């Protein structure tokens, strides 16, 4: 959930609910997920999304005026990443304010597409690929989560270290497939 301070609910298939939000709720979600078989997250199947390649995603821009906490006294804003052909599994974004959570829904008008036909062709409930927390200057981010498991953060000098996965299991074990978590809800 996005709140001040920022915390992530990062579990496969997490389905937080709107309303009261606290650590007990996160624990209950984790217990419920652990008690049932794994179900892969929803993948968006869309011919329009299939067209959003590397070059095209560089042209799709989040509108800074639509950022979470834009126009408030918060020193940070949160911008969102658009889905594309490399990231087709949306993450759910929840905002926690005054101890209550609410889901933040994707809207086309949050992005500048540069291609009006593409914007119209994309599903209305597309979802987000992830988010980034912007520095007070609004020009650079200091934390980003995108896709199933990618994240990065900058240090005190605003320099990124290595990009990373949240956790990886059996990365060098012969005969075993690598496993890693999926970020599905924040």
Where are these regions (language model features)?
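Short, intrinsically disordered, charge-balanced linker/junction segments flanking boundaries
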Residues: 181-186
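Solvent-exposed N-terminal domain segments of exported/luminal and surface proteins
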Residues: 31-176
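Short N-terminal segments immediately surrounding and downstream of signal-peptide cleavage
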Residues: 16-34
């Amino acid at each position: 959930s996005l709140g001040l301070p920022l915390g992530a609910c990062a579990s496969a298939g997490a389905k937080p609910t709107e309303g009261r939000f606290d650590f007990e709720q996160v624990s209950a979600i984790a217990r419920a997920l652990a008690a049932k078989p794994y179900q892969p997250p929803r993948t968006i199947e869309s011919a329009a999304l299939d067209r959003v390649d590397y070059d095209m995603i560089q042209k799709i821009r989040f509108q800074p005026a639509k950022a979470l906490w834009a126009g408030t006294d918060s020193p940070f804003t949160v911008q969102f990443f658009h889905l594309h052909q490399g990231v087709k599994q949306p993450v759910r974004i929840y905002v926690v304010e005054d101890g209550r959570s609410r889901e933040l829904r994707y809207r086309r008008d949050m992005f500048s597409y540069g291609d009006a036909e593409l914007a119209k062709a994309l599903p209305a409930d597309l979802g987000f690929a992830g988010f980034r927390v912007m520095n007070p200057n609004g020009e650079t981010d200091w934390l980003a989560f995108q896709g199933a498991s990618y994240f990065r953060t900058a240090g005190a000098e605003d320099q990124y270290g290595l990009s990373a996965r949240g956790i990886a299991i059996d990365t060098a074990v012969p005969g075993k497939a690598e496993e890693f978590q999926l970020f599905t809800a924040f």
